[in-house]
Amino acid sequence: GGGGLGYGSGVGLGSRKDVGISFETPVIMGALPKEAILKVIRQNQNQIRYCYEVQLQKQQDLEGRVKIKWVIGGTGDVVKAQLAESTMKSPAVENCIIEKIRGWKFPAPAGGGIVEVVYPWVLKAS
């Protein structure tokens, strides 16, 4: 492989890349409506964008699909979150997203059970 250094990294004070975040179908198991989960994800979308943008400053060609699996406990708190799959290969982005998700608050599942969510984000600069 090469050294990876190139001219014109594209970082400029006046330029800001638009970041595209697209959604795929989440996998949800448990007694919480999909719409309730998606609402919380949408409300926190800027946190996901932040995780990506910070690393994009350092690596201009960074993009990929990051799939996170998390468990919502009986009170609506995220009790566990982990990387399920990633084509991005950026531990900094992946760990940042996991940390953000751990702080999210969902509605309490019906009957106090747990809900498992697997959610994929596709992140790329446009």
Kindly label every feature range from the protein language model.
Residues 1-42, 126:
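Intrinsic-disorder/low-complexity signature in envelope-associated proteins
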Residues 18, 65-67, 116-118:
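Broad gene-expression machinery/nucleic-acid interaction feature
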Residues 22-24, 73, 84, 124:
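A structural detector for beta-sheet-dominated domains
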Residues 30-35, 39, 46, 53-62, ...:
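Short, positively biased Gly/Pro-containing turn/loop motifs at secondary-structure boundaries
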Residues 63-75:
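Short edge beta-strands and adjacent turn/loop segments
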Residues 68-70, 81, 119-121:
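Preference for bulky hydrophobic residues occupying beta-strand positions
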Residues 78-93:
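Short glycine/proline-centered loop/turn elements that form peptide/ligand docking sites
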